[in-house]
Design a protein with these regions (language model features):
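Extended substrate-binding grooves/exosites of carbohydrate-active enzymes
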Residues: 1-62, 72-77, 82-91
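Short hydrophobic alpha-helix segments
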Residues: 7-8, 95-97, 149
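Conserved, mostly hydrophobic/aromatic
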Residues: 48, 67, 129
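Extracellular ectodomain segments of secreted/surface proteins
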Residues: 50-60, 152, 156-159, 163-164
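Hydrophobic residues positioned within well-ordered beta-strands of beta-sheet architectures
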Residues: 63-65, 81, 110, 127, ...
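Beta-strand-rich N-terminal accessory domains
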Residues: 71, 133, 157-173
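Intrinsically disordered, low-complexity Pro/Gly/Ser/Thr-rich segments with frequent PxxP/GP/PP motifs
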Residues: 89-124, 128-132, 139
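Short beta-strand elements
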Residues: 136-162
Length: 173
């Protein structure tokens, strides 16, 4: 699950395989983990976290979303949920979701009103759901995000153009 590559002597580089002049060796076999040797996340760690997240959100259309508890033996009472609406990458509205009282493997549909913001023509809008721990655990502090999902709310609104005055001359040569 984690890389097993020690630091090279007098270097900030982590070594593996033939870096220690040890032949034969297993090549990069010891650096195929999800976590780097210094216990920082690799890109694979974020992918594994996403795949194993305990809450899935599915867009159903017309402002409705299906929340599913992917846990097999526990409810979601230890989590709280929030959603944010982003306009061109900036949060313009956020709110808490109602209590996540979903038993193992259960689902429920929620509705989020689409009129909470005034949409600007030409802007792009997304909704992001976040699910975080209510309390500290042995492995992470309260507030740690265990699941998230993002959906495009709509294509960016078309800008409104006013017809200009005057004329255009086309000269073909």
């Amino acid at each position: 699950w984690c890389n097993h590559s020690p630091y090279l002597s007098n270097s900030s580089k982590m070594g593996y395989g033939g870096d220690f002049n040890d032949t034969p060796n297993d090549g990069n076999f010891c650096t195929n983990g999800v976590i780097f040797s210094d216990r920082t996340y690799s890109a694979k760690a974020y992918e594994v976290k996403k795949i194993h997240q305990p809450v899935w959100v599915e867009a159903m259309g017309n402002g409705t979303y299906k929340l599913t508890n992917k846990r097999f033996h526990a409810g979601l009472d230890d989590l709280y949920g929030r959603y944010e609406i982003e306009e061109d990458g900036k949060v313009v509205f956020s709110a808490n979701l109602e209590e996540l009282s979903l038993n193992a493997q259960d689902s429920k549909v929620i509705t989020i009103a689409d009129n909470q913001i005034n949409k600007i023509p030409g802007a792009e809008y997304f909704i992001k759901f976040r699910f975080c721990q209510k309390q500290d655990t042995e492995w992470e502090k309260a507030g740690y995000e265990v699941a998230s999902e993002q959906f495009k709310l709509s294509d960016s609104a078309k800008p409104v153009f006013k017809a200009g005055e005057g004329s255009i001359d086309l000269i073909e040569t």
